[in-house]
């Protein structure tokens, strides 16, 4: 693999954003399906995150110190796979010939068949609740200082599960959870409920106990400041970055236009888009990696727990025995997960 850029300034991050847009267009047009415009709106956000803030060892996805990146807007998979190309874990050939093909690991919505994907997403409103679970595990079970970054779409902000997740994140003081909301104003059926009304989103986030940061989602300097502030693990609140963006940003024929959700650009149109975006690029980047942390804590310690005992022949309802055991094990807070 060629030597990647590792000391990435904002100018290079902006170039990376353009590359992610170009590759989102190329891959979806090649596949004949996909969501390029939804990917283009969030490209700058992800370019700055991956190149300057996400602490991740791409060669060791099982490193317990790695940050976690969850695409709650899983339909923006062209963007995620373009990121994987940019960090060198998949090739341009795989991106162009594998995306959305039968039998390929580059599925229409990301799944853990890829070692860098924690959870399968695509059902809107699912990714942030997943992120809360991962953040809980990091803070209370493993006690490892990773951050959980969740990319959300503005359409899914109408889902109740998003707000339930934020409520629980604030209750459990998950400062290690950062949601990035791509407010591009347009959903599958037209304008979203609140459009670009970031003040309404801000009031709702704060009402549920979160810290809101409102930015221009195409200003790489503003993005960089917001990510640095959110990722500092200061305070006790989850952070929600509310980024105003343009769907299809960078290509004038589709930018902020309705009826382009979930539609690949026709071949000739895609060529014009690539030209307007400055042509193909093949930047290779690597951002920060996690520092050497203490091994994560094993949540066992059963010797400290006095389990219920019953006399031979004593009749005990299974649900009561199960409940008694859970109550005893639960005396050690957040040390037990059961289904």
Language-model segments: residues:
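Thiamine diphosphate
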Residues: 1-149, 199, 282-338
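Glycine-rich ThDP/TPP pyrophosphate-binding loop and its adjacent helix/strand module
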Residues: 56-62, 66-68, 105-280
């Amino acid at each position: 693999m060629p030597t990647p850029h590792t000391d990435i300034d904002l100018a290079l991050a902006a170039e990376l954003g353009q590359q992610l847009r170009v590759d989102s267009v190329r891959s979806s047009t090649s596949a004949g399906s996909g969501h390029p415009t939804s990917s283009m709106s969030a490209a700058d956000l992800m370019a700055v995150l991956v190149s300057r803030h996400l602490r991740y060892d791409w060669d060791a996805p099982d490193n317990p110190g790695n940050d976690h990146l969850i695409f709650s807007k899983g339909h923006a998979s062209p963007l995620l796979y373009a990121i994987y190309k940019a960090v060198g874990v998949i090739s341009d050939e795989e991106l162009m010939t594998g995306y959305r093909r039968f039998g390929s690991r580059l599925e229409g919505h990301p799944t853990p068949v890829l070692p860098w994907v924690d959870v399968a997403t695509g059902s809107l409103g699912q990714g942030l609740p997943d992120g809360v679970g991962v953040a809980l595990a990091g803070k209370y079970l493993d006690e490892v200082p990773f951050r959980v970054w969740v990319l959300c779409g503005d359409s899914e902000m109408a889902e109740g599960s998003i707000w339930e997740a934020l409520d629980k994140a604030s209750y459990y003081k998950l400062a290690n959870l950062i949601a990035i909301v791509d407010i591009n104003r347009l959903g599958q059926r037209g304008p979203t409920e609140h459009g670009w009304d970031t003040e309404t989103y801000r009031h709702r986030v704060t009402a549920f106990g979160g810290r809101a940061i409102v930015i221009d989602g195409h200003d790489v300097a503003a993005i960089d400041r917001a990510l640095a502030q959110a990722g500092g693990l200061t305070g006790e609140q989850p952070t929600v970055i509310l980024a105003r963006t343009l769907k299809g940003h960078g290509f004038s024929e589709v930018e902020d236009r309705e009826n382009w959700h979930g539609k690949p650009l026709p071949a000739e149109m895609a060529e014009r888009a690539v030209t307007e975006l400055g042509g193909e690029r093949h930047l290779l980047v690597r951002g920060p990696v996690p520092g050497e942390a203490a091994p994560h804590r094993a949540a066992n310690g059963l010797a400290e727990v006095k389990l219920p005992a019953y006399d031979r022949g004593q009749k005990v309802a299974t649900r009561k025995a199960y409940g008694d055991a859970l109550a005893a094990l639960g005396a050690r807070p957040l040390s037990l997960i059961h289904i």
